[in-house]
């Protein structure tokens, strides 16, 4: 399987190179050169699998067996621990750089990042929003020599591996909600995707292209660039980001739309390059008529106000005693609109990305009460530490200098290992775990949106690690698998259970991040 840039000016690469990369050198995003097509027999087989097993089978279609032995992708479900920054605090082999947008995330989210006063945690409070934070990250990744020197890697949805594992959400949702897989043709299922940067939406479009009969509904808040693009072909910025209760979706530049445009254009890199270069230059572009037609056929969309978010949270609690986070409520609001119209519809699944505990402002706005965990209450009384990145500062230089300083510190005392730069998304996901003394699971299940983390994971311990497994990386992957996070799924079933019933459904598994263990191990053995 080869991977190509959406803009067509970068060399094609294999999965390993796609995994350890961010933006392509030409500014595009990596996509598979070809998509596998799945028949009815494969769908039947996959419908009986657990979520981790489904992820494993899906990944095997996109990763050559010569790169990833099957033993390296074992996994079982379970609960994650705390957020990534909490997981690695004090670890001797990890440094974390966190960039948070001051005023654009909840107080709890900010405290979770700024109250960790360990030597290996470096938090910056940026006077900017998430789109503005993307710019220095993109600039850093555009410097190919710098990226190679420091082995930098992005694990937000810029990285193909992030989108790949999200494809499994849509297959699993379909298998849980489809009335039967024996119908000809297969019955469709509607998947409502609360959308910010559009990574999960891109995953859904890929699942469609692979043969999964789903209809995608894009649910956005008042930052409605995707809604306007689908409705009228207007891919243009508003005057400013609008702060909403669903703060993780307060995004004006949904960069994964480039992947969707490329997919629906028939992989026409020339068209996409011209389109995206115009957008980057003028902040506004009208989609070509044919591309807009294909987009509106593939997905529909709705924009949801803060008032609708709070009404949905209240209604879901009243009807189901289930407390939605505001992002989940954006999706469920679309569901309620269809229910209230009493229009016939296929089974429907709403993806639910986060816990309401991190959004007390939204809970209060919905006139609901929240049983706040003691760990979150304790944050109010902790000392905080945060270095400002002010408007007018050179954020790119500050980020580069920090990465270089940390690399220099490590290189002066430890062998060079694996460095990762991560932009943390709003949903639960596992990054990487190394099996060895002093190492911990790196995961985010607490919506610490907009963070950039540099994770330095050293391969020093792999050759000497005592383990009965013939592959230390496999042991590490198995250990990481025990700490996956199950997120609740809300769906409109046909089996008689109440609409909106919470079920253990969409698992934010990040199996592919474990692949990094395998590569790190093999390089150290060489």
Regions found by a protein language model. Name each.
Residues 420-526:
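Small-residue-rich alpha-helical packing segments, especially N-terminal targeting/signal peptides
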Residues 1-417:
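PLP-dependent amino-acid enzyme catalytic core
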């Amino acid at each position: 399987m080869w991977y190509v840039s959406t803009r067509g000016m970068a060399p094609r690469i294999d999965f390993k190179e796609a995994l350890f990369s961010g933006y392509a050198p030409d500014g595009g995003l990596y996509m598979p050169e070809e998509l596998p097509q799945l028949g009815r027999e494969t769908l039947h087989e996959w419908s009986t699998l657990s979520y981790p097993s489904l992820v494993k089978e899906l990944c095997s279609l996109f990763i050559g067996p010569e790169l990833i032995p099957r033993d390296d992708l074992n996994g079982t479900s379970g609960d994650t621990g705390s957020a990534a920054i909490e997981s690695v605090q004090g670890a001797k082999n990890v440094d974390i750089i966190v960039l948070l947008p001051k005023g654009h995330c909840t107080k709890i989210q900010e405290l979770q990042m700024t109250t960790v006063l360990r030597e290996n945690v470096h938090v910056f409070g940026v006077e900017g929003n998430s789109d503005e934070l993307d710019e220095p990250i993109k600039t850093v990744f555009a410097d190919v020599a710098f990226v190679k020197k420091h082995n930098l890697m992005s694990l937000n949805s810029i990285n193909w591996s992030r989108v790949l594992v999200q494809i499994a959400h849509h297959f699993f949702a379909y298998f849980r909600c489809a009335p039967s897989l024996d119908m000809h043709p297969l019955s469709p299922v509607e998947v409502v995707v609360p959308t910010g940067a559009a990574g999960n939406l891109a995953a859904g479009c890929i699942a469609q292209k692979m043969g999964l009969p789903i209809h995608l509904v894009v649910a956005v808040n008042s930052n409605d660039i995707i809604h306007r693009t689908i409705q009228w072909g207007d891919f243009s910025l508003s005057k400013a980001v609008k702060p909403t209760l669903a703060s993780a979706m307060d995004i004006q530049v949904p960069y994964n739309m480039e992947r969707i445009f490329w997919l629906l254009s028939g992989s026409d890199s020339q068209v996409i390059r011209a389109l995206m270069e115009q957008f980057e230059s003028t902040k506004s572009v009208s989609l070509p008529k044919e591309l807009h037609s294909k987009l509106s056929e593939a997905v529909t969309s709705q924009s949801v106000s803060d008032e609708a978010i709070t009404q949905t949270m209240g209604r879901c609690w009243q009807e189901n005693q289930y407390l939605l986070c505001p992002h989940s409520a954006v999706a469920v609001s679309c569901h309620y609109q269809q229910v209230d119209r009493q229009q016939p519809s296929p089974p429907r699944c709403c993806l639910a990305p986060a816990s309401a505990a991190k959004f007390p402002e939204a809970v209060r706005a919905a006139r609901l009460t929240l049983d706040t965990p003691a760990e979150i209450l304790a944050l109010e009384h902790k000392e905080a530490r945060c270095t400002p990145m002010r408007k007018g500062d050179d954020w790119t230089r500050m980020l580069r200098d920090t990465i270089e300083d940390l690399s220099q510190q490590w290189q002066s005392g430890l062998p060079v290992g694996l460095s990762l730069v991560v932009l943390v998304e709003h949903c639960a996901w596992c990054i990487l775990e190394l099996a060895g003394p002093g190492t911990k699971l790196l995961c985010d299940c607490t919506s610490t949106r907009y963070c950039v983390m540099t994770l330095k994971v050293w391969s020093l311990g792999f050759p000497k690690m005592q383990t009965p497994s013939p592959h230390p990386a496999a042991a590490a992957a198995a250990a990481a698998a025990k700490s996956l996070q199950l997120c609740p799924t809300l769906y409109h079933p046909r089996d008689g259970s109440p609409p909106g019933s919470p079920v253990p459904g969409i698992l934010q598994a990040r199996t592919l991040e474990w692949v990094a263990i395998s590569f790190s191990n093999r390089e150290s053995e060489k």
